[in-house]
Amino acid sequence: CVDNLQNNIVDERDSFWLREIEKVALNQSKHTKVLSALAIDNTPERAHELLLKTKYWSELINPYPERHKIYPNEELTLDFKEVTREDLTHLKSFAIDNSDSSEADDAISLDGERVWIHIADVATQVDIDSELDGYAQKRASNLYLPDQTIHMLPPNLSSFCSLGESKKSSALSVGFKIIDCQINDIKILQSEIEVVKMSYEDADKALKEDQVLSKLNNLTKSHKAFRNNNGAIKLDLPNVDVKLKNKKVDIQIQTESESRKLVAEMMVIAGRVIAQYATEHKISMPFLTQEVGSFSEDIIQNKENLTATQAFQATRCFKQSKITPKASLHAGLG
C-alpha cells in the first residue's frame, strides 16, 4: 500500500487504507498509520491532497460540509398551517433576485402612499422547541456553496414558504408611510400576496417603465441620501458569485445595478421600520448596533468616491457591530 501511494497509484487491495485516509480528510479521525508511514502530516488538508493525487477522490468532491460537521439537507414530514391573512393580492408585489435564484424571500409593493415590504412567512410554520425548530437551530442559516446550497430549513418547507411559488403567497408584510424620510403609520400583518418574480436585469429595464418600481426607486434614493447625511458609510467593494457549472468553476463579478441598490435600500428601510415599531410598542427583540468608526476626515469627505485602495483601508475603521436588547445607533447605516 505504501509503495503504491508513493507512486500515486492504487488498487482494490488498498481500499481499507484509503478509507482510513478518507476519515482523516473528513475530520472523522485524527490519525492513520499509512499517512505516518508516508511521512505525511495527519491533517485533513494533506489527506485530501493525497486522495486527489491517487484519483481516489474526484476534484468535484467537496469535503468541507462533512469535515465541519454541517448537517445536510433533510426532508421532514410537515403539516403546513393555514392562518387568517389580510388580502393584499390587489397589489403588484415584486420579488427581485438573481436570475438563477430558485427561492424568493422578500417582495416590495406600493399602495398609494403606503409602502409594503413582504417577507416570506416562515415563522408561522415553526413552533418553538419543535422538531423543526431544532432542525433550524442546528444549521443557523442557509449555506451557499459553489456546488450546492445547504438550507437552514427542510427544502420542502423552503419551497412552500418561497414567494411566488404559487399564484398566491403567504407573507409577513410590513406597511408604512414615509414622508421627508420619517417613518409613520406602521402596520405589520400576515398577508396573502400575488408575486411578480423578476431578475435584476429585467428589473433594471422596468425601472423607467413601471410606475410602482419607478416611485420605489426614487423613494430609496431619497432615503439613501438621508442616511448619508446622517453619517452612513457604505464601501463599494467588489463582490463575486462563485458557482460550479457543468463541472467547471464559474466566477462572475456582481454588477452594482439600479435594481440591486433599490432592493438593498428597501431591506435597510425594513430593518429601520421594524426596529421603530418594536421600540414604540415595547417589544423585546435583538437590535444590531454599531458605534461611530474612527474614519479620517478625508474618507468622510470623499466617502462617495473612494478608490478601491481607500475603501479596503476604510474597512479597518469600522467599530464592531453588536447585538443588544436595547435599540441604539447603527453608525454604518446612518
What role is predicted for each listed range?
Residues 59-74, 280:
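Reverse-transcribing Pol proteins
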Residues 3-64:
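Extended, domain-scale alpha-helical bundle/helix-rich regions
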Residues 3-7, 19-24, 36-39, 67-68, ...:
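Electropositive polyanion-binding surfaces
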